[in-house]
Amino acid sequence: MRVLNRLLQRLVILGLGIFSVWLIVFVVFDTAAQRLPWILAEGLTYGNAAYLILPRVIRMGLKLLHRKRVPSFTTTGDGLPGDPVNVALVGTLAQLRAAFAALGWSEADRLGLASSWGMIRAFVFNSPYPTAPFSTLYLFGRGQDVGFQKAIDNSPRKRHHIRFWSLSLVRAEETWAGGSANFWLNTDRPPDDERVLWVGAGTRDTGLSLTHLTFQVTHATDSDTNVERDFIIAELENIGSIEAVKVYQAGQCLATERVNHYTTDGRVTLASLVVDGR
């Protein structure tokens, strides 16, 4: 029965793929090509395919596959896999900010029209923008609470960066008893002055690229996120901002004071912030 269900799921996914190709090529492009110059028709087709059709088709496919396991990655606004979760720090928001400020990292601006335009200009002209905004990724049902970055060679095209989502230590302990899914589906953001678990996703941007599934314009990212995780932790260790550093393998229970359990499908480095956040 399970084999039959998987076969049916894959047939439906195949059907969605064929349908999306037909829609893009024979409906969107053919219609646009009849009414617009070729270059405009190509641009319109790309925009519809990358930002409207493919994200929705992929999201439907993910729902059909019942991706209900505890994620080891964040998700984009379209529900696609984003950056992997690879860091967990315990402390207050002030401590988190102080630790990364001591490294010379800058806190990212909130994403908006002004900051997005500033990022576009900086990217095109390769001019410094140390507080450039991040695209929004989702974990615990919300976008990142805070993010930090450090430009490489003073370029906005290449940078170390990490997003963080806060989770109350008390809330984490309570939700675990009800099952691992509840841990990740929790959407409550704790107060800024509370000592919390900061779940982070750190990656290194290497230039300009297109997303693999929808071909949207984005930063190219180094595929080896373990290197970036280890780099961030080593930097924090070198300045004495963290202690009790441990690396947890997939499926292991992670304990830190009031948090009894924390599981992941990938390796997550856990540490406690000890920097003075005042």
Residue map of PLM features:
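Terminal, regulation- and interaction-focused segments at domain boundaries
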Residues: 66, 71-98
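Amphipathic alpha-helical segments
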Residues: 91-111
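Functional cores of ribonucleases/endoribonucleases
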Residues: 132-155, 161
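Active-site-adjacent core segments of small-molecule enzymes
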Residues: 32-37, 57, 70-76, 80, ...
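Membrane-embedded segments
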Residues: 105-134, 139-140
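Membrane-proximal, solvent-exposed terminal domains/tails of membrane-associated proteins
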Residues: 81-82, 87-90, 150-278
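N-terminal alpha-helical membrane-insertion module
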Residues: 1-68
